[in-house]
Amino acid sequence: MNSQTEQSNLTIPTLNDACRQRLRKLRESMGLSRPKFADMLGIPSTTLKNYELNYREIGGGTLLLIAQHPMLASHFHWLTTGQGNDPAKLGAPQ
C-alpha cells in the first residue's frame, strides 16, 4: 500500500512545476524583470531564473520571503495552491 499515492494525486515535482509557473506569472504581471524581482526578494537573479526554468526546486526559505514581503504576501496563497486571485487578472500588485 502506497499511502502517499493514495492520499494525493499530486506529487512534489508536480506541485513545484505549478508553483514555478505561477511565480513567473506573478513576476511578469508586476512588470518586473528577473533581476528586479530577485532583488526585491533578496535572492540572486540566477536563483530566480533556476526556479522559473525548473532547474531548481523553490525552497521553503524563498517561499517564506514571498509570504512576508509586503507586496507579495497577498499572492502567497495563489502562488502555492493556484486558488484565489490570479494577480495577472487583477492587475497586480495589490
Give, region by region, the residue ranges found by the protein language model.
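Short, charged recognition helix plus adjacent turn
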Residues: 3-13, 77-94
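Short amphipathic helical patch at the helix-1/turn junction of helix-turn-helix
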Residues: 17, 28-29, 57
